[in-house]
């Protein structure tokens, strides 16, 4: 299993005080030296964390492949095309969101996504699409010419947290999942089945399959049971763990878990 370490949240901490601390390049070096198979970053339209200069510097200095997440905004796409990352992952994006809230709607934005894929392919950049786990999305991703899909694991992660952590008793409880435990268990099982079925179908179509969003040290084991998934992109939980253990140990522990 490849581990993509997303270092966006290192930049979130830096931007909170508008200083160059923590240094994103130091985070890059530590992650690479601690077992990351890939570095993932998201250049958002609002530049709330990763900046254009970060992309250039990370591309220049990374010793492992760089997966660059981006929206289908043409200005952003042109930057990606110039930087030529090892892969571009197209994701949905809304300015008011705290984090990416769902998968890319390949049907509603088919024309724009098709344009984005063509532009990136013209620059010899493979494309992954961040999508919800459904058979229809897998088939549409294949039709659009993507090489890979990244399955959105947010629903699974939220259900797992509401069932197996203190999240329901916190200020950040997920209101739509404030349900009886038997209902949460049923929905969690269904979310895993959706992920498994989507991964199997994508694999049969010849698409590489990644997964990400909300994955952490407690829930990742269940995703590892889906053999068709070959890559996990994990960020916030690693950076959160690093506050207490240091980034090197946080990456090493996640690498150990995902290598089983």
Residue ranges and their predicted role:
Residues 132-192, 198-201:
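Histidine/lysine/aspartate-rich catalytic loop segments that bind and position anionic ligands
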Residues 3-7, 39-41, 66-68, 88-90, ...:
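Hydrophobic faces of well-ordered beta-strands that scaffold small-molecule active sites
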Residues 1-69, 74-75, 79-85, 143, ...:
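Conserved N-terminal beta1-alpha1 strand-loop-helix module at the mouth
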Residues 6-24, 65-72, 99-107, 124-133, ...:
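Active-site mouth loops of central-metabolism enzymes
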Residues 73-84, 134-144, 211, 215-229:
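Catalytic cores of alpha/beta
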Residues 90-97, 148-161, 228-247:
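Glycine-rich phosphate-binding active-site loops on the catalytic face of alpha/beta enzymes
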Residues 48-74, 108-128, 173-210, 254-259:
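Alpha-helix-loop-beta-strand connector modules within alpha/beta enzyme cores
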Residues 59, 102, 163-176, 184, ...:
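C-terminal helical cap(s) of enzyme catalytic domains, especially alpha/beta-barrels
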């Amino acid at each position: 299993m490849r581990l993509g370490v997303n270092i966006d949240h290192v930049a979130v901490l830096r931007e909170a005080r508008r200083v160059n601390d923590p240094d994103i390049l130091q985070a890059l070096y530590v992650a690479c030296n601690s077992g990351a198979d890939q570095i993932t970053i998201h250049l958002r339209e609002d530049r709330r964390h990763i900046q254009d200069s970060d992309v250039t510097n990370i591309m220049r200095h990374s010793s492992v492949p760089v997966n660059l997440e981006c929206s289908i905004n043409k200005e952003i796409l042109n930057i990606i095309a110039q930087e030529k990352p090892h892969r571009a992952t197209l994701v949905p994006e809304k300015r008011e969101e705290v984090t990416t809230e769902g998968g890319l709607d390949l049907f509603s934005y088919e024309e724009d996504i098709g344009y984005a894929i063509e532009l990136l392919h013209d620059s010899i950049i493979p494309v992954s699409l961040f999508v919800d786990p459904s058979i229809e999305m897998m088939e549409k991703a294949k039709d659009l010419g993507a090489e890979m899909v990244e399955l959105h694991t947010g629903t699974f992660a939220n259900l797992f947290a509401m069932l197996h952590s203190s999240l329901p008793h916190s200020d950040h409880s997920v209101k739509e999942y404030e349900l009886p435990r038997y209902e949460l268990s049923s929905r969690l099982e269904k979310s895993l089945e959706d992920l498994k079925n989507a991964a199997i179908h994508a694999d049969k179509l010849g698409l590489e399959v990644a997964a990400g969003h909300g994955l952490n040290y407690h829930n990742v084991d269940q995703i590892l049971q889906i053999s068709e998934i070959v890559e996990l992109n994990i960020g916030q939980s690693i950076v959160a763990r690093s506050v207490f253990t240091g980034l090197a140990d946080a990456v090493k522990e996640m690498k150990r878990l995902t290598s089983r």
